[in-house]
Curated annotation (Swiss-Prot):
<dbReference type="InterPro" id="IPR047872">
    <property type="entry name" value="EFG_IV"/>
</dbReference>
<keyword id="KW-0547">Nucleotide-binding</keyword>
<keyword id="KW-0251">Elongation factor</keyword>
<comment type="similarity">
    <text>Belongs to the TRAFAC class translation factor GTPase superfamily. Classic translation factor GTPase family. EF-G/EF-2 subfamily.</text>
</comment>
<dbReference type="InterPro" id="IPR005225">
    <property type="entry name" value="Small_GTP-bd"/>
</dbReference>
<dbReference type="InterPro" id="IPR005517">
    <property type="entry name" value="Transl_elong_EFG/EF2_IV"/>
</dbReference>
<dbReference type="InterPro" id="IPR004161">
    <property type="entry name" value="EFTu-like_2"/>
</dbReference>
<dbReference type="InterPro" id="IPR027417">
    <property type="entry name" value="P-loop_NTPase"/>
</dbReference>
<feature type="domain" description="tr-type G">
    <location>
        <begin position="66"/>
        <end position="347"/>
    </location>
</feature>
<dbReference type="InterPro" id="IPR009022">
    <property type="entry name" value="EFG_III"/>
</dbReference>
<dbReference type="InterPro" id="IPR035647">
    <property type="entry name" value="EFG_III/V"/>
</dbReference>
<dbReference type="Pfam" id="PF14492">
    <property type="entry name" value="EFG_III"/>
</dbReference>
<dbReference type="Pfam" id="PF03144">
    <property type="entry name" value="GTP_EFTU_D2"/>
</dbReference>
<comment type="function">
    <text>Mitochondrial GTPase that catalyzes the GTP-dependent ribosomal translocation step during translation elongation. During this step, the ribosome changes from the pre-translocational (PRE) to the post-translocational (POST) state as the newly formed A-site-bound peptidyl-tRNA and P-site-bound deacylated tRNA move to the P and E sites, respectively. Catalyzes the coordinated movement of the two tRNA molecules, the mRNA and conformational changes in the ribosome.</text>
</comment>
<dbReference type="InterPro" id="IPR004540">
    <property type="entry name" value="Transl_elong_EFG/EF2"/>
</dbReference>
<feature type="binding site">
    <location>
        <begin position="146"/>
        <end position="150"/>
    </location>
    <ligand>
        <name>GTP</name>
    </ligand>
</feature>
<dbReference type="GO" id="GO:0070125">
    <property type="term" value="P:mitochondrial translational elongation"/>
</dbReference>
Length: 761
């Protein structure tokens, strides 16, 4: 697997209750009042509901929520997330020494606890921890999750953001907003997660925070303004100026653990005032109170500015921007202060779910972050631990106690919480109970990611908003070198359960096990983990693109399945039409007069689902088809569910092949960054692949090209890029869309498929 390919659907999903189209979902849980609830569309509407809920909270609940922050650290790969998190843990006293990524000191960053993570210098799994931060003589509790930057491991970001209340978005001061930054921004919007932004690597040559802020405004389309100005830059970075209260902050001590406050340097005073005015002007555009002050020509106080930043940030209308260097131990502590000042506490976030009614309809309900309400929790992540399956749970309502029983909503089973722990990367600390808003883990519970648990004895059947799971874009065959099928099967089952984007199926025709995922790196990591964790060496086939099949014009069908071989035969006739649609696949019936009984129509729907999994052209999944059955015929003796299911198979194939079918291939958004002297070589390489260049940005030393290329053309691109740039170029891929293949490619794919099918007979 030479190249590192990464892909994910660019589907925007509103947070609370809509389920994504053409994607897998996980049902979760929610619980509260019985009255009908209207879903809010904006944060202002959410806040009305939040304020009502907060009126019912007890002082102890409010106090606990005020001191709690659930935050994630997200960014493009190599922006310094894990290095930043390591400093956070050190400055909060959670670890006693700083260790670097890649395990250069034989230890490695605390949050990258897998050997593979430390060897490769990347985060593969999200890691959870907790720490405390003191500000203004008050102690605040942070639940912190460090997430991967590789698009291949995007599900780790999805499930982290699903349960977090806020985030720190880390942006590289040199590279600025990159492809995965845009993806992470979209994921934050999907789950309505507010963020503060930290511009990292200010000590690097070419660092330009103002360009990065312009890109945040332009590319991420969220108002952003600096609340700091750097003191020095690149190798001369000394500290930052807090422009809100006009104070210079210097990191001192061997590892920057001490903050010294001083007056603003004389040569920066003009810039500080300029950026302060820009901050106030930006806030006036997104906050009514600041707008009133601004229009009246008054000078806002420090408290008024901070209040406006907090309201606008929590309202997801603005992101404050801080800057520094995690590696150089500069500017980290002010970010922790900003987490306290500007990111929401649990009772400032509206968590909504669905309660199943007796008529099978679903009613939206809101959760209360109170320990006195019935328990509701979401299992958002699974890991294989030394004591069995480790299940991470976010407590949305009530409290969870060691030794207590809770109900698994999906199965209705009662399970006992035999052990309750807080996680610190791969270490754990036993606790007796956790309250609303907290994140914990427990052992010995049989469940899947996204399952909901409620307190024992609770009558409501409740599911929370769904977690978005992107479709796989790449597959390969895999088999153990030896006959150790037991360990191999155990590994497959475990990894599927832990990672919803890792798919496994057995191809009965080729007699092969096929694994599918988000990219070559994604699958490569799992092949390596099977070897390391289960002692099973595997042989893998060449990576295969996950094509799709679709139709382009409507097509009518009239198909009769008739089989007679003595005794009762098989008979089923279905009539209708097939149409191309842009949304999810759809099956519909409009039968008048009961010509086809309901049980046979149900069999038809199952037949339709069968056909979607394996299209008539090359055996790949079908996309964007609407099948309507509006007439048909039965036989009093020979008609059966099997007959109508088989008839649907025949009708589907008949209509599909008559509807000018096409083969769709994944088109990837490719971003290549390399030194300027290699620009011609890189552009030529992309053109050779048949790619379409959309944008080129030239920096002082490097350039970045954004293009669209077919995934099929990208195999081996890593090697080609390395050769074209003397090993100095890097690239990332993200799934963009499905697009029809060229006619000659479609013809070749069909011929190869037909040849392979004939060889099996």
């Amino acid at each position: 697997m030479a190249s590192v390919l990464r892909g994910v659907f660019k589907t925007h999903l509103p947070r609370t209750l809509t389920r994504p189209k053409c994607a897998r979902t996980f049902q979760t849980t929610t619980f509260l009042r019985n009255e009908q609830v209207k879903l809010p569309q904006t944060y202002d509407e959410e806040k009305v509901i939040i304020d009502e809920i907060n009126k019912s909270l007890k002082p102890d609940d409010l106090q606990a929520s005020t001191r709690l922050r659930n935050i994630g650290i997200s960014a493009h790969i190599d922006s310094g997330k894990t290095t930043f998190t390591e400093r956070v843990l050190f400055y909060t006293g959670r670890i006693k020494a700083i260790h670097e990524v890649r395990g250069k000191d034989s230890v490695g960053a605390k949050m990258d606890h897998m050997d593979l993570e430390r060897e490769k210098g990347i985060t593969i799994q999200s890691a959870a921890t907790y720490c405390s931060w003191d500000k203004d003589d008050k102690s605040y509790h942070f639940n912190l999750i460090d997430t991967p930057g590789h698009i291949d491991f995007t599900i780790e970001v999805e499930r982290a953001l699903r349960v977090l209340d806020g985030a720190v978005l880390v942006v590289c001061a040199v590279a600025g907003v990159q492809s995965q930054t845009v993806t992470v921004d979209r994921q934050m919007r999907r789950y309505n997660v507010p963020r503060v932004t930290f511009i990292n690597k200010m000590d690097r040559m070419g660092a330009n925070p103002w360009r990065a802020i312009e890109q945040i405004n332009a590319k991420l389309k969220i108002p952003a303004a600096a609340i700091q100005v750097p003191i020095g830059a690149e190798e001369n970075l000394q500290g930052v100026v807090n422009i809100i209260d006009r104070v210079a902050l210097y990191n001192e001590g061997e590892q920057g653990e001490t903050i010294r406050k001083a007056e603003v340097p004389e040569d920066l005073k003009e810039l500080v005032e300029e950026k302060r005015a820009l901050l106030i002007e930006t806030l006036a555009d997104v906050d009514e109170e600041m707008a009133d002050i601004y229009l009246e020509g008054e000078e806002p106080t420090v408290e008024q500015i901070k209040g406006a930043i907090r309201r606008a940030t929590i309202g997801r209308k603005f992101t404050p921007v801080l800057m520094g260097s995690a590696l150089a131990n500069r500017g980290i502590q002010p970010v922790l202060d900003s987490v306290v000042d500007y990111l929401p506490q649990p009772n400032e976030v509206l968590n909504t779910g669905l309660e199943l009614q007796k008529d099978n309809s679903e009613k939206p309900v809101h959760l209360t972050p109170s320990t006195s309400e019935p328990f509701v929790g979401l299992a958002f992540k699974l890991e294989e631990g030394p004591y069995g399956q480790l299940t991470y749970i976010r407590v949305y309502q009530g409290k969870l106690k060691k030794g207590a029983y809770m109900t698994h909503v999906k199965t209705g089973k009662k399970v006992k919480v035999s052990r309750l722990v807080r996680m610190h990367s791969n270490d754990m600390e036993d606790v007796a109970e956790v309250g609303a808003g907290e994140i914990c883990a427990t052992f010995g519970i049989d469940c899947a990611s996204g399952d909901t648990f409620i307190g024992q004895g609770t009558q409501q059947q409740i599911t929370m908003s769904s977690m978005f799971v992107p479709e796989a874009v790449i597959s390969l065959s895999i088999s153990p070198k030896t006959k150790d099928n037991g360990a191999f099967s155990k590994a497959m089952n475990r990894f599927q359960k832990e990672d919803p984007t890792f798919r496994v199926h057995y191809d009965s025709e080729s007699k092969e096990t096929i694994i599918s995922g988000m990219g070559e790196l994604h699958l490569e990591i799992y092949v390596e983990r099977i070897k390391r964790e289960y002692g099973v060496d595997c042989v893998t086939g060449k990576p295969q693109v996950s094509y799709r099949e679709a139709i382009t014009v409507p097509s009518a069908f009239d198909y009769t399945h008739k089989k007679q071989s003595g005794g009762a035969g098989q008979y089923g006739r279905v009539i209708g039409e097939m149409n191309p649609i842009e949304s999810e696949n759809k099956f519909e019936t409009q039968i008048i007069g009961g010509k086809i009984p309901e049980k046979f129509l149900f069999a038809c729907s199952k037949g339709f689902e069968d056909c979607l999994e394996k299209g008539p052209l090359i055996g790949h999944r079908v996309l964007g088809v609407h099948m309507l059955i509006n007439d048909g015929q039965t036989h009093v003796v020979d008609s059966s569910e099997l007959a109508f299911r088989t008839a649907t198979h025949g009708a589907f194939k008949q209509a599909f092949l008559n509807a000018q079918p096409v083969i769709l291939e994944p088109i990837m958004s490719v971003e290549v960054t390399a030194p300027n002297e290699f620009q011609g070589s890189v552009v030529g390489l992309i053109n050779k692949l048949g790619g379409m260049i959309n944008d080129t940005v030239n920096g002082p030393d490097d350039f970045t090209v954004t293009a669209e290329c077919s995934l099929n053309s990208m195999f081996g691109f890593s090697t080609s890029l390395r050769a074209s740039t003397q090993g100095k170029g890097e690239f990332s891929l993200e799934f963009l869309k499905y697009s029809p293949t060229a006619p000659q490619v479609q013809k070749q794919l069909i011929q190869e498929y037909q040849k392979a099918q004939a060889a099996k007979k």
